[in-house]
Amino acid sequence: MYLENINGPSDVKKLTIEEMNKLAAEMRDALLKRASIHGGHFGPNFGMVEATIALHYVFESPEDKMVYDVSHQTYPHKMLTGRKDAYLYEEHYDDVSGYSNPHESEHDFFNVGHTSTSVSLACGLAKARDLKGGKGNVIAVIGDGSLSGGEAFEGLDFASELKSNLIIVVNDNDMSIAENHGGLYGNLKLLRETDGKAECNFFKAMGLDYVYVGNGNDIGALIDAFKSVKDAGKPVVVHIVTLKGKGYKPAEEDKETWHWHMPFDIKTGKPLMDFDGEDYSSVTAEYLLDKMKKDKSVVAITSATPTVMGFTADKRHEAGSQFVDVGIAEETAVALASGIAAGGGKPVYGVYSSFIQRTYDQLSQDLCINNNPATIIVYAASVYGMNDVTHLGIYDIPMISNIPNLVYLAPTTKEEYLAMLEWSIEQNEHPVAIRVPDGEMISDGKKVSKDFSELNRYEITEKGSKIAIIGLGSFYGLACKAAKEIESRTGVKATLINPYYITGIDGELLESLKADHDVVITLEDGMLDGGFGEKIARFYGNSDVKVLNYGLKKEFLDRYDVNEVLKENHLTPEQIADDLSLQ
């Protein structure tokens, strides 16, 4: 095997073109086996194998610095930079993250997981090199829809003024996670159709030199192109056309499904765990499609992650013009939603919690200052969500719940969620965000008659005394378990409260607890600092009521074990009962 003998880029440089092609085949075999067992980003990595080999053959990493956009396509890069064991041997699969990580290797320069940042980061490295009078190439690798993000445009705009070495490799596989959206991709299509010779060339218009490689899976052609731009004295774009999912037929034929994939059977391509039940994504799509048929002013918005709202290709087709994908442009999604709402439409934007960080300014300025009644559905906002350090969904409550005018809701069940969604779409007084519970969807069949227009009204779901437990959103279930544990130990039946609202407090209800409660416990599935519990603690600050806030401490977590994190933060029923006994 060639791959077993690759311990670093210097070993790649010893190979002939024929040997590199054999290496590429071995790398795909290893990637396929690993993905079938471990899951992960599939299509992007299969398409980048040859380009990665060619990059490491031509350039001198780490002296020459490579910055991968999103870095979800760095599996081949890691295989060639001393981390092959994490792809060859099952017992080492978890040795590396799914993204670039400077703690793993000197060949990685940033922790990266969000899109459209590579060109700006690479510009920074190039500027630092120039300030120090250094040499070496700086290479940004960008693709999979990342060019649709605003920061990519900003980076390209700045790059044209660098007047020093910067190489931007545009990996054009004609896909984002789903299909690409935006006028730029029409120009990429034109460039593909004309072998890069079209007069209308976006990159040249930005003031950048341009090289085209029609077969970005041809190692020889790639090596020639990279050699031609190595040590270039000004910024240049190398536009390579690759096949997403190359080498595995199911991935080549269904690029959207195979962008990221759960473990699967290699022969059939079918997932090892087949889930046919409802989840919040599928429920959202079905609800919105029904709503759209009755009301043509309802529109669903995504920023390149349509399936987070359950909008698979067939559902997008069914929705037609009432479904909008703005590309990887969260800022535009929120501003667009605000504009639609201002014009009398009923926009619903679905977004991962980790990605809503990218649009804080638009939430505050374009949406909430104008108090336009758009709906934002926030997914994977939980310790149970994505666990890579770049994709954590636990920071949303402190970040957005303190923006004036915004109403942030936290349902605990399917029924509550749909009731909140219906209210939010039909009301016209506030911008509203809904924090979708993570994990298995709970459906209790109870009809929700609550009118959410009367803001910040909590509900006592079980009346007790002495101890009150407020369980926010997905942690309401933990509140119920903690109450049972406390009662089994002390005989005290705790009062259980579903607060519904993250953005405000129910002063009347909280005041009433003072009469027969000594302790109030808050539980939230997110960061404590600046979070929901602190609002409750502040309310009781000058009283005799003791408040115990439970949530996650302020830190960056990476590839963590959920149960360990919960224990570290005393977020188990037993630990909560233990803490209470010490009061």
Residue ranges of predicted features:
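Cofactor-binding active-site loop characterized by glycine-rich and histidine/acidic residues
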Residues: 24, 41-162, 298, 303, ...
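Glycine/charged-rich beta-loop-alpha catalytic/anionic-binding loops adjacent to active sites
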Residues: 29-36, 97-111, 133-139, 312-327, ...
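A glycine-rich helix N-cap at a beta->alpha junction
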Residues: 86-96, 161-175, 368-380
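Non-catalytic terminal/interface segments that mediate subunit docking, oligomerization
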Residues: 248-357, 362-372, 470-473
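Peripheral docking tails and interdomain loops at the edges
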Residues: 272-274, 385-387, 407, 527, ...
